[in-house]
Amino acid sequence: MTDYARYIDHTLLAANATEQQIVTLCDEAIAHHFYAVCVNSGYVPLVAEKLKGSAVQVCSVIGFPLGAGLTSSKAFEAKAAIDAGAQEIDMVINVGWLKSGKIDAVKADIQAVRGVCAAIPLKVILETCLLDDEQIVLVCEMCRQLDVAFVKTSTGFSTDGAREEHVRLMRSTVGSEMGVKASGAVRDRETAQRMIEAGATRIGTSSGVAIVSDDAAAAGNY
Protein backbone atom coordinates (compact mmCIF):
# COMPACT_ATOMS: atom_id res chain seq x y z
CA MET A 1 0.00 0.00 0.00
CA THR A 2 1.29 3.45 -0.90
CA ASP A 3 2.51 5.58 2.02
CA TYR A 4 1.02 8.79 0.66
CA ALA A 5 2.18 10.90 3.60
CA ARG A 6 5.85 10.56 2.63
CA TYR A 7 5.11 11.99 -0.82
CA ILE A 8 3.39 15.13 0.41
CA ASP A 9 4.70 18.68 0.59
CA HIS A 10 1.81 20.18 2.60
CA THR A 11 1.38 23.52 0.91
CA LEU A 12 -0.18 26.93 1.53
CA LEU A 13 0.93 29.70 -0.83
CA ALA A 14 -2.11 31.98 -1.02
CA ALA A 15 -1.50 35.71 -0.68
CA ASN A 16 -4.10 35.90 2.09
CA ALA A 17 -2.76 32.98 4.13
CA THR A 18 -2.90 33.88 7.81
CA GLU A 19 -0.45 32.94 10.55
CA GLN A 20 -3.08 30.71 12.14
CA GLN A 21 -3.59 28.85 8.86
CA ILE A 22 0.17 28.31 8.60
CA VAL A 23 0.26 27.01 12.17
CA THR A 24 -2.59 24.61 11.34
CA LEU A 25 -0.70 23.50 8.22
CA CYS A 26 2.34 22.66 10.35
CA ASP A 27 0.26 20.86 12.97
CA GLU A 28 -1.34 18.72 10.26
CA ALA A 29 2.04 17.95 8.72
CA ILE A 30 3.44 16.78 12.04
CA ALA A 31 0.33 14.74 12.87
CA HIS A 32 0.30 12.96 9.51
CA HIS A 33 4.09 12.67 9.05
CA PHE A 34 4.13 14.58 5.76
CA TYR A 35 7.49 15.04 4.08
CA ALA A 36 7.52 18.84 4.12
CA VAL A 37 5.58 22.05 4.62
CA CYS A 38 5.84 24.43 1.66
CA VAL A 39 5.21 28.16 2.15
CA ASN A 40 6.20 31.57 0.85
CA SER A 41 9.56 32.76 2.18
CA GLY A 42 8.00 35.29 4.56
CA TYR A 43 6.54 32.45 6.61
CA VAL A 44 9.73 30.37 6.76
CA PRO A 45 10.76 31.62 10.25
CA LEU A 46 7.35 30.69 11.68
CA VAL A 47 7.32 27.28 9.98
CA ALA A 48 10.90 26.53 11.06
CA GLU A 49 9.93 27.28 14.66
CA LYS A 50 6.75 25.19 14.51
CA LEU A 51 8.48 22.20 12.92
CA LYS A 52 11.54 22.26 15.17
CA GLY A 53 12.23 18.80 16.55
CA SER A 54 10.02 17.06 13.97
CA ALA A 55 11.04 15.13 10.86
CA VAL A 56 8.98 17.43 8.62
CA GLN A 57 11.12 19.55 6.29
CA VAL A 58 10.76 23.31 5.76
CA CYS A 59 10.32 24.19 2.08
CA SER A 60 10.21 27.71 0.64
CA VAL A 61 9.13 28.86 -2.81
CA ILE A 62 11.33 31.42 -4.56
CA GLY A 63 10.42 33.88 -7.32
CA PHE A 64 6.84 32.80 -6.82
CA PRO A 65 4.53 32.57 -8.68
CA LEU A 66 5.70 34.25 -11.90
CA GLY A 67 9.43 33.56 -11.89
CA ALA A 68 9.91 36.82 -13.77
CA GLY A 69 12.07 38.72 -11.31
CA LEU A 70 15.76 39.45 -11.48
CA THR A 71 18.07 36.47 -11.11
CA SER A 72 19.91 38.31 -8.34
CA SER A 73 16.61 38.74 -6.47
CA LYS A 74 15.89 35.01 -6.67
CA ALA A 75 19.35 34.14 -5.38
CA PHE A 76 19.03 36.67 -2.55
CA GLU A 77 15.58 35.38 -1.57
CA ALA A 78 16.80 31.78 -1.61
CA LYS A 79 19.76 32.58 0.64
CA ALA A 80 17.55 34.57 3.01
CA ALA A 81 15.05 31.70 3.18
CA ILE A 82 17.82 29.21 3.94
CA ASP A 83 19.24 31.49 6.63
CA ALA A 84 15.72 31.63 8.13
CA GLY A 85 15.46 27.84 8.25
CA ALA A 86 14.41 26.56 4.82
CA GLN A 87 15.64 23.03 4.14
CA GLU A 88 14.35 22.79 0.56
CA ILE A 89 13.87 25.44 -2.15
CA ASP A 90 11.26 25.45 -4.94
CA MET A 91 12.12 28.11 -7.55
CA VAL A 92 10.11 29.21 -10.58
CA ILE A 93 11.92 29.48 -13.91
CA ASN A 94 11.59 32.58 -16.06
CA VAL A 95 9.03 31.24 -18.52
CA GLY A 96 9.11 34.41 -20.62
CA TRP A 97 12.84 34.06 -21.19
CA LEU A 98 12.40 30.43 -22.17
CA LYS A 99 9.67 31.24 -24.67
CA SER A 100 11.83 34.08 -26.03
CA GLY A 101 14.64 31.63 -26.74
CA LYS A 102 16.92 33.04 -24.02
CA ILE A 103 18.09 29.58 -23.03
CA ASP A 104 21.41 30.69 -21.54
CA ALA A 105 19.61 33.21 -19.33
CA VAL A 106 17.20 30.54 -18.09
CA LYS A 107 20.13 28.28 -17.28
CA ALA A 108 22.01 31.07 -15.49
CA ASP A 109 18.88 31.86 -13.48
CA ILE A 110 18.63 28.28 -12.23
CA GLN A 111 22.38 28.06 -11.70
CA ALA A 112 22.41 31.18 -9.53
CA VAL A 113 19.85 29.74 -7.14
CA ARG A 114 21.51 26.33 -7.26
CA GLY A 115 24.72 28.03 -6.18
CA VAL A 116 23.27 29.39 -2.96
CA CYS A 117 21.50 26.16 -1.99
CA ALA A 118 24.23 23.69 -2.89
CA ALA A 119 23.78 21.90 0.44
CA ILE A 120 20.00 21.42 0.20
CA PRO A 121 17.56 20.11 -2.43
CA LEU A 122 16.48 22.51 -5.18
CA LYS A 123 13.22 21.92 -7.04
CA VAL A 124 12.73 23.80 -10.30
CA ILE A 125 9.15 24.73 -11.24
CA LEU A 126 8.57 24.63 -15.00
CA GLU A 127 4.92 25.79 -15.18
CA THR A 128 4.25 23.02 -17.68
CA CYS A 129 0.81 24.31 -18.67
CA LEU A 130 2.58 27.20 -20.46
CA LEU A 131 5.16 25.03 -22.25
CA ASP A 132 5.19 22.61 -25.14
CA ASP A 133 6.79 19.18 -24.84
CA GLU A 134 10.05 20.32 -26.43
CA GLN A 135 10.41 23.11 -23.88
CA ILE A 136 9.61 20.76 -21.00
CA VAL A 137 12.31 18.35 -22.17
CA LEU A 138 14.80 21.18 -22.64
CA VAL A 139 14.39 22.47 -19.08
CA CYS A 140 14.44 18.96 -17.61
CA GLU A 141 17.70 18.20 -19.40
CA MET A 142 19.10 21.54 -18.22
CA CYS A 143 18.20 20.74 -14.62
CA ARG A 144 19.80 17.33 -14.86
CA GLN A 145 23.02 18.96 -16.09
CA LEU A 146 22.92 21.43 -13.19
CA ASP A 147 22.49 18.68 -10.58
CA VAL A 148 19.06 19.91 -9.53
CA ALA A 149 17.26 17.55 -7.13
CA PHE A 150 13.73 17.82 -8.58
CA VAL A 151 11.80 19.15 -11.52
CA LYS A 152 8.30 20.33 -10.59
CA THR A 153 5.26 20.76 -12.80
CA SER A 154 3.44 23.84 -11.64
CA THR A 155 2.89 26.74 -9.27
CA GLY A 156 -0.83 26.06 -9.06
CA PHE A 157 -1.38 29.74 -9.87
CA SER A 158 -1.43 29.57 -13.68
CA THR A 159 -3.86 28.15 -16.24
CA ASP A 160 -3.54 24.52 -15.13
CA GLY A 161 -1.84 22.25 -12.64
CA ALA A 162 -0.13 18.89 -12.88
CA ARG A 163 -1.03 16.58 -15.75
CA GLU A 164 -0.13 12.91 -15.93
CA GLU A 165 1.34 13.23 -19.41
CA HIS A 166 3.68 16.00 -18.28
CA VAL A 167 4.80 14.05 -15.22
CA ARG A 168 5.45 11.04 -17.43
CA LEU A 169 7.46 13.15 -19.91
CA MET A 170 9.49 14.73 -17.12
CA ARG A 171 10.25 11.34 -15.58
CA SER A 172 11.31 9.84 -18.90
CA THR A 173 13.61 12.81 -19.50
CA VAL A 174 15.37 13.00 -16.14
CA GLY A 175 15.59 9.25 -15.56
CA SER A 176 15.44 7.52 -12.20
CA GLU A 177 18.03 9.56 -10.31
CA MET A 178 16.14 12.88 -10.06
CA GLY A 179 12.89 13.65 -8.31
CA VAL A 180 9.70 14.76 -10.05
CA LYS A 181 7.17 16.82 -8.09
CA ALA A 182 3.55 17.04 -9.24
CA SER A 183 1.76 20.11 -7.94
CA GLY A 184 -1.41 21.99 -8.70
CA ALA A 185 -4.89 20.42 -8.80
CA VAL A 186 -3.86 17.29 -6.86
CA ARG A 187 -6.72 17.28 -4.38
CA ASP A 188 -7.62 13.63 -3.77
CA ARG A 189 -6.06 10.19 -3.41
CA GLU A 190 -7.07 9.02 -6.88
CA THR A 191 -5.29 11.94 -8.54
CA ALA A 192 -2.25 11.53 -6.30
CA GLN A 193 -2.04 7.83 -7.18
CA ARG A 194 -2.16 8.63 -10.90
CA MET A 195 0.67 11.12 -10.51
CA ILE A 196 2.77 8.62 -8.56
CA GLU A 197 2.17 5.95 -11.19
CA ALA A 198 3.23 8.47 -13.87
CA GLY A 199 6.54 8.98 -12.06
CA ALA A 200 6.05 11.61 -9.36
CA THR A 201 8.13 11.17 -6.22
CA ARG A 202 6.68 14.19 -4.43
CA ILE A 203 3.20 15.75 -4.40
CA GLY A 204 2.63 19.44 -3.69
CA THR A 205 -0.87 19.98 -2.34
CA SER A 206 -2.97 21.76 0.27
CA SER A 207 -5.14 18.63 0.40
CA GLY A 208 -2.66 16.34 2.11
CA VAL A 209 -5.07 15.38 4.88
CA ALA A 210 -7.75 14.50 2.33
CA ILE A 211 -5.27 12.35 0.40
CA VAL A 212 -3.96 10.35 3.35
CA SER A 213 -7.44 9.90 4.84
CA ASP A 214 -9.08 9.31 1.45
CA ASP A 215 -11.76 11.78 2.53
CA ALA A 216 -12.40 14.76 0.26
CA ALA A 217 -14.20 16.53 3.10
CA ALA A 218 -10.90 16.70 5.01
CA ALA A 219 -9.27 18.99 2.44
CA GLY A 220 -7.77 22.12 3.94
CA ASN A 221 -9.87 25.23 3.50
CA TYR A 222 -6.91 27.29 2.39
Curated annotation (Swiss-Prot):
Annotated GO MF terms: deoxyribose-phosphate aldolase activity
EC numbers: 4.1.2.4
Subcellular localization: Cytoplasm
Keyword presence, Transport: no
Active site, per annotation: 90 (proton donor/acceptor), 152 (schiff-base intermediate with acetaldehyde), 181 (proton donor/acceptor)
Catalytic reaction annotation: 2-deoxy-D-ribose 5-phosphate = D-glyceraldehyde 3-phosphate + acetaldehyde
One Gene Ontology cellular component: cytoplasm
Keyword Transcription regulation among UniProt keywords: no
SS bonds (residue pairs): none
Keywords: Cytoplasm, Lyase, Schiff base
Role: Catalyzes a reversible aldol reaction between acetaldehyde and D-glyceraldehyde 3-phosphate to generate 2-deoxy-D-ribose 5-phosphate.
Annotated family: Belongs to the DeoC/FbaB aldolase family. DeoC type 1 subfamily.
Record's protein name: Deoxyribose-phosphate aldolase
Source organism: Pectobacterium atrosepticum (strain SCRI 1043 / ATCC BAA-672) (Erwinia carotovora subsp. atroseptica)
Gene: deoC
